[in-house]
Amino acid sequence: MKKYLVMEDGTVLSGQGYGSYKEAYGELVFTTSMTGYLETLTDPSYVGQMLVFASPTIANYALEMGKMESNGVKVSALITKDAHIELKKGGYGREFDEFLKEQGIPGIDGIDTRMLVRKIRANGVLRSYVVNDPSHSLDFPDPMNDDLVSKAVPHHDPVFVKGEEGGTVLFIDLGSKNTLKELMLQNFSLIVVDKQTNLDEIEGYDAIFVSNGPGDPSHPSLSNVIKFLSHNIGVKPLFGICFGLQAISLAYGAKTYKMKFGHRGSNHAVTDGTHSYVTTHNHGYAVDGSTVKDFKVIGWDANDGTVEIIEGDDMFAVQFHPEASPGPHDTRWFFGEMKRRIGYA
């Protein structure tokens, strides 16, 4: 089955289709992670995006369904050089091709991903389709104009998770992955809500945590969350990861911007001026450091200087993923820092 990758600049690439027969549309981005492909594909921050794996070989070890970061694959499509689509090992008994068919996600293999990564780095992310017939006329709307957070997290009633000794955290889920499990391991009690919840009606918590998520943090659909965070500056301790850092920064009055091709992968170096860490990233937006006034930037990306760690009075947030999944555990100290700042360390 032949499939085609059609980009907004007119480039058309052909390859071997696998997974679902469906066609797909999204923002074409790449990840530099060499392993952890299942965790990557199931990260809700990828909603609205088609993913290129910079690593040429994918799915060369068996699927472990317990390592999924959400309830399913979140990328719109995946583009690979050499996917082992029929690999079936051990007791898992799942082929990659079969799994993607069940998830309704198309893949296209045999693509020169090295060339494609260079193209994205040079030109920025590209709106693209994976199609079965490239002869049709196609429109290329901006996926970031959509309310991607609602696609990642449907509205639900608040969920209470009882911990043992770590205090109670209001967990604003904007597309969380493994962070929820990490906070449970820290013995926090959690009140889990989504962005459509009336946050002002929730009571009985000691701190507020804002999760990662997809899309543009300044999207109008998130205005109620930003307003709520703004009203709680200096009232409750605020914490955030990735998208959460951006949302908190907006609440303080800072600005965010869209990056040329973003940071995605489990091998990004971050420095605080004293220590350096290897971290996992998945974001296409960042905080404009020149607009920061009422909090401090205390960590930066070692390659391009992107804002990575911020702190203020009763506020602490990171742009990277200390829970990794996939990736290194250099920054798991973040969760201990949360407990210390809340007063339960």
Curated annotation (Swiss-Prot):
L-glutamine binds at S45, G213, G215, F243, Q246, N282, G284, Y285. SUPFAM superfamilies: Carbamoyl phosphate synthetase, small subunit N-terminal domain, Class I glutamine amidotransferase-like. InterPro entries: Anth_synth/Amidotransfase (IPR050472), CarbamoylP_synth_ssu (IPR006274), CarbamoylP_synth_ssu_N (IPR002474), CarbP_synth_ssu_N_sf (IPR036480), Class_I_gatase-like (IPR029062), CPSase_GATase1 (IPR035686), GATASE (IPR017926). GO terms for biological process: 'de novo' pyrimidine nucleobase biosynthetic process; 'de novo' UMP biosynthetic process; glutamine metabolic process; L-arginine biosynthetic process. Residues 168-345 form the Glutamine amidotransferase type-1 domain. Its EC number is 6.3.5.5. The active site is at C242, H321, E323. It catalyses: hydrogencarbonate + L-glutamine + 2 ATP + H2O = carbamoyl phosphate + L-glutamate + 2 ADP + phosphate + 2 H(+). Pathway: Amino-acid biosynthesis; L-arginine biosynthesis; carbamoyl phosphate from bicarbonate: step 1/1; Pyrimidine metabolism; UMP biosynthesis via de novo pathway; (S)-dihydroorotate from bicarbonate: step 1/3. One of its GO terms (molecular function) is ATP binding. Residues 1-169 are annotated as: CPSase. Keywords: Amino-acid biosynthesis, Arginine biosynthesis, ATP-binding, Glutamine amidotransferase, Ligase, Nucleotide-binding, Pyrimidine biosynthesis. Pfam families: CPSase_sm_chain, GATase. Belongs to the CarA family. Small subunit of the glutamine-dependent carbamoyl phosphate synthetase (CPSase). CPSase catalyzes the formation of carbamoyl phosphate from the ammonia moiety of glutamine, carbonate, and phosphate donated by ATP, constituting the first step of 2 biosynthetic pathways, one leading to arginine and/or urea and the other to pyrimidine nucleotides. The small subunit (glutamine amidotransferase) binds and cleaves glutamine to supply the large subunit with the substrate ammonia. Composed of two chains; the small (or glutamine) chain promotes the hydrolysis of glutamine to ammonia, which is used by the large (or ammonia) chain to synthesize carbamoyl phosphate. Tetramer of heterodimers (alpha,beta)4. This is Carbamoyl phosphate synthase small chain. It comes from Thermoplasma volcanium (strain ATCC 51530 / DSM 4299 / JCM 9571 / NBRC 15438 / GSS1). The lineage of its organism: Archaea, Methanobacteriati, Thermoplasmatota, Thermoplasmata, Thermoplasmatales. The gene is carA.
